[in-house]
């Protein structure tokens, strides 16, 4: 295992992308950062720039307006990057599957390494999913 992959397992930096969600999943991400759940005990840090990220955490159904933005974000991310789709909408478009402006699930456009289902997923589930992705390295 290379040195960079070992470092990634110990302190992953996560960048969140919302592709048209209702905001419930975003609130659960914030819950992960509170002292009750303390995702930082695993070395996970939420970053403000995709250029610093090791993991992309994507929520929401992919809309026509967000598709070009998601592609730009994915292309700007340093490789290798792990992609996690979370929430019912992030995994398979949820209740917005047949909406006029939904183009399809995220894995139709970029490769996804893990799925965290739920509407919204609980903070424990989000943390467990991220840790499992990192343990798969």
Cite the ranges covered by each PLM segment.
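Iron-sulfur-associated redox domains of electron-transfer enzymes in respiratory
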Residues: 1-137
